[in-house]
């Protein structure tokens, strides 16, 4: 049982879309250095698009970027977004690169479902599991449905919310994994277990937050079209019905930076790494967000 803090209040530094290249790795590391110094997190989470183009040596770039965390002995974990597939590296091989970097917390991985970085990390303090951090792999585009289901090539999938991307997010098999695994863990524990979700591509429910600002207690900035998934895998509904998920935190968008309340949960969309990161302080029942602008 890995202890992440004492007292049961965890500090999570969440960032996405670092998009590392040989040209920007050192500058990105300097930015992360400042963020780590300001946030003093118990755990850092790379929430997708750490890479988004072909690169010669991802391990070296990742080691450079994460140097500030390594030097401070800050553990970190990760989930893949759509950018990781653009490296041209098979996901299993790229996953092994991430795992090889010091400080990586791999978590308890799910087998037999879509993606390689679906994982659960029990967040422990003082010998107890305070909540579960659940990571989902959202590496696909909706064009993948052409091969899987024979849908028309590159046709826009109609959806009530406008999204200018062909994004696919958490799929039904991943939603079913959460439902099965969560029930099993609660039964084994003998009591409900709180969860916090982190994955790259926002859900359609995230896009509802800025459209209903008063009702959802909107906080932040909404200044670009939503890049939410256009095929709804049902993860928000499953989370709400469980009554055990406190927050669903996503990325993928560039400058949108907001959170709000939906069905008793906090739904949040973080800006890309170039614009900042979030320090999320939580005991598993509620999440407080502080924006880091290093």
Tell what function each PLM region has.
Residues 20-22, 52-55, 78-90, 141-145, ...:
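Active-site environment of divalent metal-dependent phosphoester hydrolases
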